[in-house]
Amino acid sequence: ALLNICLSRLSTNPLILFLFFGITSVLINAFCFKKYVKYFMISMLFYLVHTYVARELMQIRAGLACALCLFSLRYIVNKCPWRFLITIILASSFHLGAVVFLIAYPLGQYKFNSKKVAIAIICALIISSIFPLGAFFKSLPSYAFLNRIQYYNDTEYGQSSGLFTNVVIIKELLIIIVCLAYRRVLENIPYFNVSFNTYVVSLIWLILWNDFSIVASRIATFYSIGEVLLMAMLPFITKSGGSRNILAVLLILLAGVIMFMNIYTGKWDGVVII
């Protein structure tokens, strides 16, 4: 991407570039959490115990691009298409994959009912079972514009991530089911609709491309940016007072479980948070 080339001209030290991408991503995310949700610390906690490790430390360019996509949600909610477009162009200058987030603008303007969401997910499951898109893609002849993706065919990134054996798909499906069950309460929260709609797209994409993990994860990463926002909105499904505080504590404990799972699986090996 263009800005990556410009930054590399300023310094050849990879540590400086890493610090720039990492610090900028964290600051943008923290700013957005503070503006978008009431339970800021819940979003921040889930971000640090998982997203920060799985994305910012492993895909630093995608991490910054995702942070800018998260920032662009305000322009979807406030219906500022040109500002949204400029923000996505900026994100694309760091990681070209951010271009796919352009579809988020029209998605954010609609309120899909629970029935349509359920039908879309069921259709995705059926399609992935009878017509695996990854297998079809891998069978295509070698074209120049496909070379970059087809390179992963014979690597671990081209393998199937599974459907109901895929922890990410199960997690996203459970979050969506909870959101649908309490939608009447949650839909009154300003950023719920756009976060939920894009999150549904993330799940559908993961299901459709489950047999080609690199394609599934690269695109779903951008559409799952609202996950930490949705987690911070869940306390509102209970009545204010003790019940809401108890649910907030349970979410904090869940974040702790996720952190220990990441440590156990080795994702945190050598990671030191200062």
Label every model-predicted segment.
Residues 69-82:
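Membrane-interface transmembrane helices that cradle and orient dolichyl/undecaprenyl
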Residues 10-24:
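Loop-to-helix entry region of an early transmembrane alpha helix in multi-pass inner-membrane enzymes
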Residues 122, 239-260:
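Signature aromatic-anchored transmembrane alpha helix within multi-pass, membrane-resident enzymes
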Residues 52, 83-107:
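Membrane-interface alpha helices of multi-pass inner-membrane proteins
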Residues 1-12:
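Short hydrophobic/aromatic helix or loop-helix immediately within or flanking a transmembrane segment
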Residues 30-49:
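Transmembrane-helix signature of polytopic, membrane-embedded enzymes
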Residues 57-63:
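Short acidic/glycine- and proline-prone juxtamembrane loop motifs at membrane-interface regions
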Residues 105, 109-219, 262-273:
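Alpha-helical transmembrane segments and terminal signal-anchor/GPI-anchor hydrophobic tails
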